[in-house]
C-alpha cells in the first residue's frame, strides 16, 4: 500500500483493534515520521508497533507496506522486498484485491532496482491485471507506468555492456526499450483521458528519454516539448529544467546546435534559480561543448572556465580534470598555445591523482604536441597563474570525488579542431545522457563513450598541432606571454 492509503487504513481500523490501540498509535507516529522525511525513526516506530501486536490483518498489512516503503527509501532493498512480500501474502489471505494490486506494484518496483527484471515484470503485470479487473483506472495507470520503467531500466542495464550510440544498441536492448515505449504510451493515453497533467508530463518525459535511446530524436523532441509545456503550466521548475536539458541533448544529435544552446542556456538559468550547483556546472559544460560544435571557441572557453570554477567549488576532481581538458582544447583552437599547455598539464596532474590512465595518456600526448609547437622541451613547466581560482588548492587526499560529478551528469564530449570542415562536425557528437524522470543517474555508458572518444581522437589532435608545427620556423611567444594568468 502507498503511505496515504496506509494512513487511511490505520485510522479506519482503530475501533477494530481490541487491545491494539498501542500498536495503532505507534504505527501512526511511524507514518508521521516517514512523511516528515525521517524514515529511519519511522522504521523504529513501525517495528515497535509490530512488537505491541494486533489481531487486525488490515492494520498489520498497512504496517508491512509502510515498512517496505521506508526501507526502500533508505536503500535497504532486501528488507523492502521482505516486507512487501509479507504485505502481498496478507492481502491474498484477506482476498483484498486492491491491496494485492498495490503490494504487487511495490514489490515490482523494489525488484526493479535490485536488477531482478523478470520477477519485477511479473509483479507489475499482476498489478495491471488486477487493476483492470477492478476497473481502477488510476491503479491501472500506475501499473502501466511501472512496467514502462522496468523495461526502460532493463534496456539501459543491457546497453551498458556495449559501446553504442543512441539508436545503435543490440536488438535485445531495442526490444526492451520498445516495450517501455508501448507501456508509456498506454499510460500517457490513460492519463490524458483522466486529465492528470502531472502524470501526463511524467509519461511524456519518459517517452522522450526512451525515444532518445532508440535514436528517434525528432520524436524525443516532440515528447520533451510537451513535457516542457506541462511543466511550465503547473509551475514545476525542476521538471522544466530537466525538459530543457533533454531537449538540448536531442537537438545536438540532430545537428541543431543553435537550438541546443538555447535550451542549455535555459537549463543554466533554471539551475541557478533552483540553487542546484552540480546541474549549473553541467549546463556550463554542455554550453562549452555546444559552442565548440558551433566553432565559437571564445564563448566555449568562457563556459568551460565557469565549469572549472564550479567543479572546484564542488570539490569534483573528475569534473575539474574534464574542464581542464576542454579548456586546453579551446585555447589550442584559439591559438593560445601557452594557456593550452598549462591546462594540459593540469589535466595530466589531476588524471594522475585519480589513477585515470587514459586521461594521463591523452594529456601527455597533448603536452608533447604543444611543447613542439612552442619550441619547448617536453619536460618544461609553464609558469602557474597566481591571481585566480588557478591558485593552490586543497590537497587531493582531502577531497572527495562527488558521486554525481558533472561528467556523470554530462552531455557531450568534443575535441575542438578548427581544421575540420563543417560537414565533419556531426561525427563529433557523442553519447548524451537523457535525464530520467525518476531521477536516476546512469553514468557508466556515458563514461565509456567519452573514453572511446578520447582514445580514438588522440591521433587527430596530434595531426592538427603537427600541421601548425611544420616548416614555418619556431613559433614566437604570443604578446600576452608575459601575463601568467591563462
Give the positions of each predicted feature.
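Eukaryotic all-alpha helical interaction scaffolds
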Residues: 51-53, 71, 91, 131, ...
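Alpha-helical segment of the N-proximal tetratricopeptide repeat
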Residues: 22-54, 69-76, 156, 168-173
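Conserved alpha-helical positions within TPR/SEL1-like repeat arrays
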Residues: 24-35, 59-73, 84, 99-113, ...
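Long, low-complexity intrinsically disordered regulatory regions
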Residues: 1-17, 167, 181, 378-443, ...
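Structural signature of alpha-solenoid helical repeat scaffolds
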Residues: 17-18, 55, 95, 135, ...
Amino acid at each position: 500500500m502507498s503511505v496515504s492509503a496506509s494512513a487511511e487504513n490505520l485510522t479506519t481500523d482503530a475501533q477494530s483493534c481490541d487491545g491494539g490501540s498501542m500498536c495503532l498509535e505507534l504505527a501512526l507516529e511511524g507514518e508521521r515520521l516517514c512523511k516528515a522525511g525521517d524514515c529511519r525513526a519511522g522504521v523504529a516506530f513501525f517495528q515497535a508497533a509490530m512488537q505491541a501486536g494486533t489481531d487486525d490483518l488490515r492494520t498489520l498489512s498497512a504496517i508491512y507496506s509502510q515498512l517496505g516503503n521506508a526501507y526502500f527509501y533508505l536503500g535497504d532493498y532486501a528488507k523492502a522486498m521482505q516486507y512487501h512480500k509479507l504485505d502481498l501474502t496478507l492481502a491474498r489471505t484477506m482476498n483484498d484485491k486492491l491491496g494485492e494490486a498495490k503490494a504487487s506494484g511495490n514489490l515490482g518496483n523494489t525488484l526493479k532496482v535490485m536488477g531482478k527484471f523478470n520477477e519485477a515484470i511479473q509483479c507489475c503485470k499482476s498489478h495491471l491485471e488486477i487493476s483492470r479487473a477492478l476497473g481502477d483506472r488510476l491503479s491501472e495507470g500506475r501499473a502501466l507506468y511501472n512496467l514502462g520503467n522496468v523495461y526502460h531500466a532493463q534496456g539501459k542495464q543491457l546497453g551498458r555492456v556495449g559501446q553504442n550510440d543512441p539508436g545503435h544498441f543490440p536488438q535485445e536492448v531495442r526490444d526492451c526499450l520498445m516495450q517501455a515505449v508501448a507501456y508509456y504510451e498506454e499510460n500517457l493515453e490513460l492519463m490524458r483521458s483522466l486529465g492528470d497533467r502531472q502524470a501526463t508530463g511524467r509519461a511524456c518525459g519518459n517517452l522522450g528519454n526512451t525515444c532518445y535511446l532508440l535514436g528517434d530524436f525528432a520524436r524525443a523532441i516532440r515528447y520533451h516539448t510537451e513535457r516542457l509545456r506541462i511543466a511550465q503550466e503547473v509551475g514545476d521548475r525542476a521538471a522544466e529544467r530537466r525538459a530543457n536539458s533533454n531537449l538540448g541533448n536531442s537537438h545536438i544529435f540532430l545537428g541543431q546546435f543553435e537550438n541546443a544552446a538555447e535550451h542549455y542556456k535555459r537549463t543554466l538559468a533554471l539551475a541557478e534559480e533552483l540553487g542546484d550547483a552540480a546541474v549549473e556546472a553541467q549546463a556550463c559544460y554542455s554550453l562549452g561543448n555546444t559552442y565548440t560544435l558551433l566553432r565559437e571557441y571564445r564563448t566555449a572557453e568562457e563556459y568551460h572556465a565557469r565549469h572549472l570554477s564550479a567543479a572546484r567549488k564542488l570539490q569534483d576532481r573528475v569534473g575539474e580534470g574534464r574542464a581542464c581538458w576542454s579548456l586546453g582544447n579551446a585555447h589550442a583552437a584559439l591559438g593560445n598555445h601557452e594557456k593550452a599547455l598549462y591546462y594540459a598539464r593540469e589535466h595530466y596532474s589531476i588524471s594522475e591523482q585519480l589513477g585515470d590512465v587514459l586521461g594521463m595518456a591523452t594529456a601527455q600526448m597533448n603536452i608533447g604536441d604543444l611543447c613542439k609547437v612552442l619550441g619547448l622541451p617536453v619536460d618544461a613547466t609553464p609558469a602557474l597563474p597566481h591571481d585566480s581560482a588557478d591558485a593552490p588548492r586543497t590537497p587531493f587526499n582531502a577531497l572527495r570525488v562527488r558521486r554525481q560529478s558533472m561528467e556523470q551528469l554530462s552531455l557531450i564530449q568534443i575535441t575542438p579542431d578548427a581544421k575540420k570542415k563543417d560537414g565533419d562536425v556531426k561525427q563529433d557528437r557523442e553519447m548524451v545522457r537523457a535525464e530520467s524522470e525518476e531521477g536516476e543517474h546512469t553514468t557508466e555508458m556515458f563514461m565509456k563513450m567519452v573514453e572511446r572518444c578520447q582514445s580514438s581522437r588522440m591521433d587527430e589532435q596530434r595531426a592538427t598541432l603537427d600541421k601548425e608545427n611544420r616548416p614555418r620556423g619556431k613559433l614566437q611567444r604570443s604578446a600576452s606571454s608575459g601575463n601568467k594568468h591563462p
